[in-house]
């Protein structure tokens, strides 16, 4: 389920108060124990520790820190030749559904760019798909990056093709840290 609004397309994250661009890293989280504190109780929509069983988990962090700004759980989907987004959400302080005072802009687009990047690495040319959490979010993804509404497996299922996914990759810049 995807609970992310795309507020701005920025090459990094943008501090909502100062407008300053903040450099980021993408970190793959392999230790389930680390994910325990990212759960429904504290605004992360699901228990991320459980998602690590069948997915690769990636976090957008401020460069040089473990200050997580968003999480995404993905898995390759060979039948659809795309990456499947199992879950995606921003940190509560970046979630416009939870706070009026956002800390960083650009987290949502950043998370989608990570998925497109991993799709490229898997040989799927950037294609990705998943289930939006609501009709409002589905319409938002159609508008923001020309997602196609599929609605086959879920009423808000969508697909982003290779060309539109590559447009995301042209915007976002980050360092990978998969250690």
Please give the residue ranges for each predicted region.
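Non-catalytic substrate-recognition and accessory regions of acyl/acetyltransferase enzymes
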Residues: 1-102, 110, 117-129, 136, ...
